[in-house]
Amino acid sequence: MAIRPNLFAFVALMLSSQAIGADWAQFRGGNQMSHVGASSAPVSWEKGTAPAWRTEIPGSGWSQPIVAQGKIFLTTAISETPDKPKGMMGGVMDPSTMGKPAMPKDPIQFAVICLDPKTGAIVWQKAVAEAIPTTGKHASNTYATETPCASSDTLYTYFGAIGRVAAMDFEGNIKWTQDFGPQPTNNQFGTGASLVLFEDALVVQRYNEQEGKLLCLNTTDGSTRWTAERSPGTSWATPIVWNNQGQQQVVAAGQGMVVGYDLKSGEEQWRLGGLDTSFSCSLVADEGGVYIGTSSPGSSAPICAVRAGQKGDLTLPKGAKSSDSVLWAKTKSGAGMPSPVLVQGLLYYFGNTITCYDAKTGEEKFRKRMPGGTLAAGCPLVIGDQILVVNERGTVVTLRSGGEYVDPQESEIAAEGEFFWATPAAMDHALLVRSSAALYCFGTP
């Protein structure tokens, strides 16, 4: 049920008079870098502020809500047996659950939900598949963690646990489906890598314990353009499309290795190996390079930067900190689960801490404990010169960008017993935040 209070007050930062387009059409936005641009979406609010609306979402899911053609879309997994995800301490950090997933006994509806941005009312709900998964997931994860994406006339969804990709119109009518099979994952944590849409190409990553495939599909019918294979190994990091000195490349991070492929042909252009752990967070890039942070829950891992324009095997010799191809590398720097953001030459990583680096040199500018007494799992957003991240308890932490640390603002979402692992999304004048139970809208939808 959607709840709309009579009075709504918030403190919004007016960043520019130029409005951005309303669409936020794939994971981390159209540019895949979490930059909202000029917006009057609220970045903080006073204690006790009510949302514009709150809508309970059936089932469970950590997919980011997207906004396309004046509608909100998200995915969810619905079963007769309640299966709300647990937080970090009740899930990932609980040793009794590691590698011991609770296998579902009831069929699950893998569904898409469309909501009205003004009221939060559910407009329609459509199941693209119904099945009992043959692979497990961790107590912290869901069977609907992959974020959908949208073009001007088509919505694309992916449920990695069963391997189904579906295309539908904005009324929920299915255009085509493709099935690639289930994905067994490391420690039975479950899946998480989202689709990537670039023009008429749809990229599907299937890095799991049985296979290592990256596929490029035609958006018109789901047929496969190319497949790039590598050794098996689970990755939860969503690929990015990077303009590498005029060539559009798909950069995919998997177990111990990052590889850049030509988007048109699927041919490998470069690879960086020697990265010892798996990937939970995705990459960021600019014209100067691509910035890599490996991450596993509870472990520290290397971060590094690959210079633009490189070809071949870029793997550093053991103990090396840089090369002609690698701008810099740091060991045991702990990227965390949220994907980083890049703002005016500065690289920000979030997790248990907030860490800022100079993107060109790797110099650490500051490292501070994450406010709110817990970590963040969802990715941050960049709104003007503000960086916003939601920790798992629902505290919205807003940091002003810059090499000098300034104590962040903290805004609370009153959500007793709910967890927040999904990445928030922005509309022109509103912020969308998903919890384990509901979707919240703050601002003026």
Positions of PLM-derived features:
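Bacterial N-terminal signal peptides
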Residues: 6-18
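Noncatalytic, solvent-exposed loop/strand surfaces
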Residues: 20-445
